[in-house]
Swiss-Prot record:
GO terms for molecular function: endonuclease activity; metal ion binding; RNA binding. Its main location: host cell. The lineage of its organism: Viruses, Riboviria, Orthornavirae, Negarnaviricota, Polyploviricotina. Its cofactor is Mn(2+). Mn(2+) 1 binds at residues 41, 108, 119-120. HAMAP family: INFV_PA. It is found in: Host cytoplasm; Host nucleus. GO terms for cellular component: host cell cytoplasm; host cell nucleus. Phosphorylated on serines and threonines by host kinases, including human casein kinase II. This is Polymerase acidic protein. It comes from Influenza A virus (strain A/Gull/Maryland/704/1977 H13N6). A motif (Nuclear localization signal 1 (NLS1)) lies at residues 124-139. The keyword Transit peptide does not apply. A motif (Nuclear localization signal 2 (NLS2)) lies at residues 184-247.
Length: 716
């Protein structure tokens, strides 16, 4: 048992448990069951508090990927696991600051949200018996009791379970795993029987009256009484043959558990078909910026003024012509739309006072591009319910697409460093409590690694475009407003810089519901010749609009400048999430933090500094056909950030489905790598669920191809 405890629990927990036992003069080598029980209890207390924070409004939130600007403090103070003197000091200080009644016994946690101490119990017996013993022992109305059992049951004061379903499920799953691990080593029975009750024991707890009637009413079918059901449950040992257990539970279930071996999994089948095309709302690696440094012009910061100033930095405009038509669109209209933008910007400059916003004339080309008057007329259901052949349109299945090489190039580009900084140091939220100097140190190191990353540029560009579009959609519902696509950054020398990527013209936007769509036409500058990868640009009409002089090693060269024009659409809810893209920074920071935590618990000290400053060490970044790719810690930060940003840019139902379903297969494969001898049933069904999400989405197809590389290397 002692070996099992040392293997199964985090070294920090084991050390705390040993300390606690020594404090009471007990020997972990002799009282091994108690050793295991203390470790389990400690782990449950820590899991209880994990990820739970309080934001600046005093609301409780769960942060696994939260808002980077939130001022967060931990929701729970952990008292369990501190030495007695320290623990009482913490309790006293909480009582002094909050005015809560001082408990007689040391509780396990304090909840800053509900302002109460919590006693956590983990029992190998029945939860309500253990609950009563606890309640009798502490005899305090004020301390909240929450009991978990190894069978997945729980009981809490006034049925108030404090935490959300998912957090409690994590704890129950962990307890169940510990139980299974013990059972598989033949340690469970002695552990289960070794539990002694609390000091004040009330013998057999009788349920009477209303509670008894409710208990009898709520039994599963085929059980005559509560005793009868209890006896059945007590005899239900989880280890052993699952098929038998399933058939015991239901006549309809006949699952054959198949062992999952190295040879079992096959690669995911990626769809065949023409290569997939770019579907992001704005250009990524192909974008070109017209920039002004140290902007100080009149009206600086007003998007339209900034845009006109940026446009004036370029002198190579020429008569536009179409170099790659859109397959299905009326291409001359796209050409006319760009000419109209140029003409109307020229008109603005000829006015005495430049307006703050510009509404475009409703020309026929813009009406066509923005789908004006194209929506079918809505008819009240009452007026047509008698129509005999009323039916929904038949919609075509989406056409399957194959993975194209451009998707991996886009991702690689997103991980690279640019020569500008896109976020300030405090972009990922501020310090809240003094304890958080470690957190702020981590945040600063992390920010330094990602502030120049191209993925960070995409975040700021996404936040700007979505904010501007949502704003215009509400403020100018009927107008075709011209919205410049702008971002701001700092150069290496710390000079401010304003960049213009192109323009958006928004259509009518009477957005009543979150999912109502606003159409827009985007026009974006680029130096990429669309004829090199025409499949990537099938949704675009591309014009050649000028020649740009570029400084290169061999002197100045002239390159054609292109304009990528397309019609697109978005909704209130998508724009709302687009404005929240900074969350990607926090999500990737937290992934890095969990790597640091793992390292710190092995070394038993905070490893933040070493982690970021030891430049020689390499870390696994991902799997490619060549094997496991490794890189510096900065590269890991940027890769995690790029993944998070692409999940936001390419969010789709296909991605949701693929992530959820492939995760199940991933867990099975990891269990196999950890020699846990996993078994599965209906593996074919799981593959089907994963593969029905592989249709045509570029980001999902790339993830599926990475998944296949992972399978290959994981099963070698």
């Amino acid at each position: 048992m002692e070996d099992f405890v040392r293997q199964c629990f985090n070294p920090m927990i084991v050390e705390l448990a040993e300390k606690a036992m020594k404090e009471y003069g007990e020997d972990p080598k002799i009282e091994t069951n108690k050793f295991a029980a203390i470790c389990t209890h400690l782990e449950v207390c820590f899991m209880y508090s994990d990820f739970h924070f309080i934001d600046e409004r005093g609301e409780s939130i769960i942060v696994e990927s939260g808002d980077p600007n939130a001022l967060l403090k931990h929701r729970f103070e952990i008292i369990e696991g501190r030495d007695r003197t320290m623990a009482w000091t913490v309790v006293n200080s909480i009582c002094n600051t909050t005015g809560v009644e001082k408990p007689k016994f040391l509780p396990d946690l304090y909840d800053y949200k509900e302002n109460r101490f919590i006693e956590i119990g983990v029992t190998r017996r029945e939860v309500h018996i253990y609950y009563l013993e606890k309640a009798n022992k502490i005899k305090s109305e004020k301390t909240h009791i929450h009991i978990f059992s190894f069978t997945g049951e729980e009981m809490a004061t006034k049925a108030d379970y404090t935490l959300d379903e998912e957090s409690r499920a994590r704890i129950k799953t962990r307890l169940f795993t510990i139980r299974q691990e013990m059972a598989s080593r033949g340690l469970w029975d002695s552990f289960r029987q070794s539990e002694r009750g609390e000091e004040t024991i009330e013998e057999r707890f009788e349920i009477t009256g209303t509670m008894r009637r409710l208990a009898d009413q709520s039994l599963p079918p085929n059980f005559s009484s509560l005793e009868n059901f209890r006896a059945y449950v007590d005899g239900f040992e989880p280890n052993g043959c699952i098929e038998g257990k399933l058939s015991q539970m239901s006549k309809e279930v006949n699952a054959r558990i198949e062992p999952f071996l190295k040879t079992t999994p096959r690669p995911l089948r990626l769809p065949e078909g023409p290569p997939c095309s770019q579907r992001s709302k704005f250009l990524l690696m192909d974008a070109l910026k017209l920039s002004i440094e140290d902007p100080s012009h009149e009206g600086e910061g007003i998007p339209l003024y900034d845009a006109i100033k940026c446009m004036k930095t370029f002198f190579g405009w020429k008569e536009p012509n179409i170099v790659k038509p859109h397959e299905r669109g009326i291409n001359p209209n796209y050409l006319l739309a760009w000419k109209q933008v140029q003409a109307e910007l020229q008109d603005i400059e000829n006015e005495d006072k430049i307006p703050k916003t510009k509404n475009m004339k409703k020309t026929s080309q813009l009406k066509w591009a923005l789908g004006e008057n194209m929506a079918p007329e809505k008819v009240d259901f009452e007026d047509c319910k008698d129509v005999s052949d009323l039916k929904q349109y038949d919609s075509d299945e989406p056409e399957q697409r194959s993975l194209a090489s451009w998707v991996q190039s886009e991702f690689n580009k997103a991980c690279e460093l640019t020569d500008s900084s896109w976020i300030e140091l405090d972009e990922i939220g501020e310090n809240v409590a003094p304890i958080e100097h470690i957190a702020s140190m981590r945040r600063n190191y992390f920010t330094a690694e990602v502030s120049h990353c191209r993925a960070t540029e995409y975040i700021m560009k996404g936040v700007y475009i979505n904010s501007a579009l949502l704003n215009a959609s509400c403020a100018a519902m009927d107008d075709f407003q011209l919205i410049p696509m702008i971002s701001k950054c700092r150069t290496k020398e710390g000079r401010r810089k304003t960049n213009l990527y192109g323009f958006i013209i928004k259509g009518r936007s009477h957005l009543r519901n979150d999912t109502d769509v606003v159409n827009f036409v985007s026009m974006e500058f680029s130096l990429t010749d669309p004829r090199l990868e025409p499949h990537k640009w099938e949704k675009y009409c591309v014009l050649e609009i000028g020649d740009m002089l570029l400084r290169t090693a061999i002197g100045q060269v002239s390159r054609p400048m292109f304009l990528y024009v397309t019609t697109n659409g978005t909704s209130k809810i998508k724009m709302k999430w687009g404005m929240e893209m900074r969350r990607c920074l926090l999500q990737s920071l937290q992934q890095i933090e969990s790597m640091i935590e793992a390292e710190s618990s092995v070394k038993e000290k905070d490893m933040t500094k070493e982690f970021f400053e030891n430049k020689s060490e390499t870390w696994p970044i991902g799997e490619s056909p060549k094997g496991v790719e490794e890189g510096s810690i900065g590269k890991v930060c940027r890769t995690l950030l790029a993944k998070s940003v692409f999940n936001s840019l390419y969010a789709s139902p296909q991605l949701e489905g693929f992530s959820a379903e492939s995760r199940k297969l991933l867990l099975i494969v990891q269990a196999l790598r950890d020699n846990l001898e996993p078994g599965t049933f209906d593996l074919g069904g799981l593959y089907e669920a994963i593969e029905e999400c592989l249709i045509n989405d570029p980001w999902v197809l790339l993830n599926a191809s990475w998944f296949n590389s992972f399978l290959t290397h994981a099963l070698k």
